[in-house]
């Protein structure tokens, strides 16, 4: 079963997808956030049943305003594209992606997804 990670942004969002084995993540694409519901509907039609959404924490490790915004967006996405939605800490994902030569939103989503997959194997 393939899993897709979402690095949500106000203007654009990055997507990454796992391989069939659920061991490796790769960047998929970056889309305008306003088009994300349609994109997720298509992914669910293509057989994706789990979305992992990056949710940031504050420097104190707490969920702050940005996490609350993500939660609100996820509730909207659940209506548009019903599936299993889970959260993964996205702290540092953009910096880690850039350190590996990929400064795209999809690259950050790959970091989020790989962390999620690694924690479950």
Predicted regions and their residues:
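Phosphate- and other anionic-substrate recognition elements at nucleic-acid/protein interfaces
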Residues: 2-3, 10-121
């Amino acid at each position: 079963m393939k899993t897709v990670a979402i690095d949500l942004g106000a203007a654009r969002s990055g997507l990454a997808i796992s391989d069939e084995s659920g061991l490796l993540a790769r960047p998929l694409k970056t889309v305008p956030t306003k088009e994300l519901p349609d994109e997720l509907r298509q992914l669910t039609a293509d057989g994706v049943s789990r979305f992992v959404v990056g949710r940031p924490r504050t420097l104190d490790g707490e969920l702050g305003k940005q996490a609350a915004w993500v939660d609100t967006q996820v509730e909207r996405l659940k209506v548009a594209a019903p599936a299993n939605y889970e959260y993964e800490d996205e702290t540092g994902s953009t910096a880690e992606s850039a350190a590996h030569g990929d400064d795209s939103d999809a690259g950050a989503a790959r970091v989020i997804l790989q962390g999620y997959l690694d924690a479950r194997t």
